[in-house]
Amino acid sequence: MRYAVVHDLAGANPVAGIRTSGIIRTRRKRNYVRVGVAELPQLLRDVDGYVGGEHTRLALKLMAYTFVRTSELIQATWSEFEFAAARSNIPPERMEMRKPHIVPLSRQALAVPNELKMLSFGSDWVLPGDVDRRKCMSNNTILYALYRMGYRGRMTGHDFRGVASTVLHEQGWPHAHIELQLVHQEQDDTSAAYNHALYLRTSSKDDAGL
């Protein structure tokens, strides 16, 4: 109608005063459904006992330890790892924010690529594909492994990031540090989706008068 008024095809816009917000309901964004913190130990035990392939089992472990994005994990190459410095360096072209990212590796996390190195058979990929080792692991491999473990609809590879954020917030780690490791921009929808524990903890302190 605005087009018609501007081009003298109509004298007035009869719906000009109607706000679409009062007619069309805005869909509320919902956070992902994922395994709760209390269930995390069982999930990790299930990962340890996974028998669907050693590369996949180790990929799940490394994702749990580092909580990087699935693409950042499966496309990793050996040149990105600094074993002496206990870290991996993800180049900007592989990052969603197009900035280089350093992933510190704990003793447990560092043990995983050491195991994978023995299974690499000379591949440049840390996680080579099952069929063609010239390619990296499929981005569905981790998801389907979680399905086979009984976590369909409750856990994806991406959800390890949310679980990690919740656990670290509950343990009192600084929010800014967690966001930095997750490579989030402050105050965006993604940050809000992952941050379950921070406001609960703050609310509890407020209720206690702290």
Residue spans of the language-model regions?
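Conserved beta-strand positions that form and line the central face of beta-propeller blades
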Residues: 17, 89, 126, 159, ...
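Basic, Lys/Arg- and aromatic-enriched nucleic-acid-binding interface segment
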Residues: 6, 10-76, 84, 95-99, ...
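Residue-level signal for tight coil/turn positions that link beta-strands
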Residues: 84-85, 107
